[in-house]
């Protein structure tokens, strides 16, 4: 272990990374809500500090593309991958400089379609209990919109409208929208739940068109009009050279999952209803495919004393839970080793990390990530600390997986910066 790893991780007091009160939904960042999104100001500041000139940027857990958008409007060639098909769809829409004339023509066509008589639904989701999650009138109107979407042949237009449709599905469903996991509204609230499907869609489209206008202006003023590349590879298993060549990336900016989907953010459950309506692949298996989705059989040692001690403490309380947590760190370590291979010498890796609790035990993810990078020839540059005033997270969660047992969620994040030797 290097001398760097023994030093306290701190931030210069005057260097504020909290961005309290900042506008986080500018440009195409307004397109779609998503759990635990990194705010664009963090990515923008990291790019300005560590990659001010156009280069190649990678986000190996890109989610809805926050860092990719910020890189693209600064002239970077951006690459992102994510295992959640809905996240990739949202990213694709946010990164597409769609011509406004084509969009407005399509919007006029959609408006005419919405005003036309609603026919018999031709295609309905089969992977969910439809009448449990949606009222009959909502199903009818969503199917009407979906039929129009199926007529679109342009990939960029289809992504734009599909993203607005996705949020409409979620907001007009019987699911609680204040939860990441899939819970039905209580009966009392259901009785008062009369969503306006077409009105909701129109509002999303107006908002997203305004965001697109901002994005197009920023993209046009970039040092160069670069390209965005979205991939579907699993960085835990490897990064194909055909997608990203070894030692070709100058900067990595990412916010990996806080932990496995069992008790942290269940991205698959959050996406499930939209994914079914959009007929996205593997909608029911997303959470299991993410890091830590498959528990280990034995508790390993990670050679990070604080992490190993925390896992042993959790194991003494709940062996199953400890093995789930350990699986996440094993996958994270493998992913970092693969990411390291595509970073050029002197390249920078910036990881925005939250240290969560499981069974009341604080897990030192920042220390673990630093150690994992040090074992693949990176050195620690700095770690900035920030409060979390504006990331969409629940105030309390159930880190023990026991009903009624809750704990406070993370209120701070570490921004770990490493450099490849």
Where in this protein do the model-derived segments appear?
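S-adenosyl-L-methionine
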Residues: 1-53
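Conserved proline-anchored active-site loop of SAM-dependent methyltransferases
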Residues: 43, 57-74, 78-85, 91, ...
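Conserved phosphoryl-transfer catalytic core
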Residues: 85-152, 270-300
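SAM-dependent nucleic-acid methyltransferase catalytic core
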Residues: 139-254, 259-265
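SAM-dependent methyltransferase catalytic-core segment centered on the flexible catalytic loop
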Residues: 258-338
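Conserved helix-to-beta-strand junction in the class I
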Residues: 335-345, 376
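Core SAM-dependent methyltransferase catalytic element
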Residues: 344, 399-421
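Conserved S-adenosyl-L-methionine
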Residues: 378-389
């Amino acid at each position: 272990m290097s001398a760097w790893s023994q030093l306290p991780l701190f931030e210069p007091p005057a260097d504020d990374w909290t961005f309290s009160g900042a506008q986080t939904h500018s440009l195409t960042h307004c397109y779609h809500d998503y759990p635990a999104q990194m705010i664009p100001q963090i990515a923008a500041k990291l790019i300005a500090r560590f990659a001010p000139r156009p280069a190649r940027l990678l986000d190996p857990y890109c989610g809805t593309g926050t860092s990719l958008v910020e890189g693209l409007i600064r002239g970077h060639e951006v690459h992102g991958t994510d295992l959640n098909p809905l996240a990739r769809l949202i990213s694709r829409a946010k990164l597409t400089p769609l011509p406004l004339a084509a969009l407005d023509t399509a919007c006029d066509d959609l408006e005419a379609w919405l005003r036309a008589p609603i026919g018999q639904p031709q295609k309905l989701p089969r992977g969910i209990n439809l009448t449990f999650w949606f009222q009959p009138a909502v199903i009818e109107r969503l199917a009407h919109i979906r039929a129009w979407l199926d007529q679109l042949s342009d990939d960029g237009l289809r992504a734009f409208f599909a993203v607005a449709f996705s949020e409409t599905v979620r907001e007009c469903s019987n699911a609680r929208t204040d939860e990441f996991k899939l819970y039905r509204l209580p009966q009392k609230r259901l009785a008062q739940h009369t969503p306006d499907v077409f009105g909701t869609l129109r509002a999303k489209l107006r908002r997203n068109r305004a965001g697109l206008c901002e994005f197009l202006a920023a993209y046009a003023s970039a040092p160069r009009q670069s390209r965005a590349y979205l991939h579907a590879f699993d960085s835990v298993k490897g990064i194909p050279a055909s997608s990203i060549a070894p030692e070709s990336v100058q900067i990595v900016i990412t916010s990996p999952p806080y932990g496995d989907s069992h008790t942290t953010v269940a991205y698959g459950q959050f996406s499930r209803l939209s994914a079914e309506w959009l007929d996205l692949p593997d909608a029911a298996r997303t959470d299991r495919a993410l890091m830590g989705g498959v528990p280990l059989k034995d508790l390993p040692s990670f050679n990070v004393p604080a992490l190993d001690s925390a896992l042993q403490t959790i194991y003494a309380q709940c062996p199953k839970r400890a093995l789930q947590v350990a699986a996440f760190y094993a996958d994270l370590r493998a992913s970092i080793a693969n990411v390291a291979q595509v970073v050029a010498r002197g390249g920078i890796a910036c990881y925005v990390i939250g240290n969560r609790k499981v069974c009341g035990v604080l897990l030192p993810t920042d220390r673990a990530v630093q150690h994992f990078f040090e074992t693949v020839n990176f050195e620690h540059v700095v770690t900035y600390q920030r409060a979390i005033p504006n990331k969409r997270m629940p105030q309390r969660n159930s880190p023990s997986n026991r009903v009624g047992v809750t704990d406070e969620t993370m209120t701070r994040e570490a921004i770990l910066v490493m450099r490849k030797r």
